[in-house]
Amino acid sequence: MATTLSFSRHGAGIGDAAAVVRANAVSSGLDAAVATCPGWTVLDLVLHLGAAHRWAVAVLDGRPQEQWPTEASVRAEGLAAGDVLDWFDDGMVHLLQVLADAPADLQAFFFLKDAPRPREAWARRQCHETTIHAVDAMAARLGSAPTAAQTWIHPELAADGVDELLTGFVPRRTGRLRTVAEEPPLTVLVRATDVDRAWTLRISDQPVVTTAGTGEDGPTGGIPDALWEGTAVGLYLALWNRGDELAETGPRPFLERWRRDQRIEWS
């Protein structure tokens, strides 16, 4: 799950997305419902993202696991702050400072296999964590998920986020994407239409096997059971269940099951 983006590009992505979170939180108000996160308000979103940033800082700082903050403790800290958006900004800036100060060969925990080195892996993870939740902040202001064209996201960053999801999160043993009893394995080809990136997912009763590559026929060739196509940003939003700008063709549709079963867990 090597990244094609630079460390500095991921850092810039964190800052860009955090600015989108703040601007939309100010516009919609902290009590506004988040259309893409049922049951959440913008305040919940800001507190969650602030907790994610602070948790990453604790890991990068090398604190023992028992000293990592819980979301509940950080939420209480944010609620006690004089201005929760200033508190959010402070956490984001601290994260960027810690990333910038970390040596390239930093040894630190990271929870996805075959990831880049920890410093790069955490910059990437926090970039996409912040970007996707910035889309949620936009959804709170708009009242529905934004289209790809309404976002600020660059296709290269979106393709990197798709890659992290499909090669990092989806193949985990805790993943829920499986065939059911007596159902034969199937392949899904995910192909971006505006950048030369493609991924083949082999789905069976075992953890998903993802192969990343390029080309119209995808990294493994052959005829897939399902083909998912869209722009890089459209795929990014759709695969994170923040949009529907993804076209599915093929004899064994699987997209509905993806939307039902694909959930992200950090542990």
Where are the regions that the model predicts?
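Actinobacteria-biased recognition of intrinsically disordered, low-complexity terminal regions
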Residues: M1-G15, A19, A23-V26, D217-P219, ...
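Conserved catalytic-core motifs characterized by acidic clusters
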Residues: Q67-E71, Q107-K113, V209-T210, G215
